[in-house]
Amino acid sequence: MLRLLLDTHAFLWWLADAPQLGDSARKAIGDERNDVFVSAATGWEIAIKRAVGKLQAPENLNAMVEESGFSHLSITFFHGEQAGALPMHHRDPFDRMLIAQAQAEGLVIVTRDPYIPRYGVRTLDA
């Protein structure tokens, strides 16, 4: 059993059934034995990018998380401290939060981001 944390692009690719999402990631996300989490940071990132016109995404993503059988992952004060303490390999604050959450909660990040593995977290290629 895996505990997966979806990076924003992996979450959106899953919802859209996009061909960009690789077979291994698709199988792992769809495997009911695995726990799949979507971070509050992902909701925040999507909302900001939608508001500034950089992303078109459905409005009801919160419900889509639940309909997909995924779990919400809240951001805690500890996660915030951990994200701030990370080395500056990656400046994206949303990805830094996902990294901190994955480290704290023992999660595998489903991502295509080449910077995330530099932090020593387990990843699965999206």
Q: Can you name each region flagged by the protein language model?
A:
Residues 1-38, 51-63, 105, 114, ...:
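Short, well-structured N-terminal submotif of metal-dependent ribonuclease cores
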Residues 13-14, 49-50, 86-87, 101:
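A generic structural signal for short
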Residues 46:
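Phosphate/NTP-binding elements of NTP-utilizing enzymes
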Residues 56-62, 67-115, 124-126:
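Active-site neighborhoods of divalent-metal-dependent phosphate/nucleic-acid chemistry enzymes
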